[in-house]
Design a protein with these regions (language model features):
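Positively charged, small/polar-rich N-terminal and surface patches that mediate targeting and assembly
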Residues: 1-125
Length: 125
């Protein structure tokens, strides 16, 4: 029986010169990450505004978010039974401005409800 050498196969992909060299890459134009945290009571209002303003068509929603900010705590317990909801949106600078206006509008409309909004830079990889 002949002695066969096993060849080692390298599965490491060749380095890409740029994102555009990767056929899986689809530029989404997302440059801003927005985190919006509000009481669950405002969830429908945000979704309605997103639809009317045609922004945040793609978002991540985290339900049952607990925390304490500048309004009443939302801890989901016997003392503070309410909970928050959190939206994470990746969007363009222009959509970010529209969403900020939605946040300000709902803050004016619901002055006693907690609404937090954080904006940071994002890069799709």
């Amino acid at each position: 029986m002949a002695d066969k050498k096993k060849e080692r196969v390298d599965f490491t992909p060749a380095p890409l010169k740029s994102k555009k060299d990767d056929e899986r890459y689809t530029p989404a134009g997302a440059v801003v990450r927005m985190e919006i945290i509000c009481t669950q009571a405002l969830e429908e209002d945000f979704l309605q505004e997103f639809g009317e303003q045609k922004v945040a068509a793609r978002y991540t929603k985290l339900a049952g978010v607990m925390g304490a900010g500048y309004s009443n705590p939302c801890l989901g317990d016997a003392i503070w039974p309410q909970l928050n909801v959190m939206f994470i949106v990746y969007c363009s600078e222009a959509d970010c401005e529209v969403i900020k206006n939605i946040v300000w509008k709902l803050r004016d409309k619901y002055r006693t409800e907690g609404i937090a909004c954080f904006v940071s830079r994002a890069e799709e990889v």
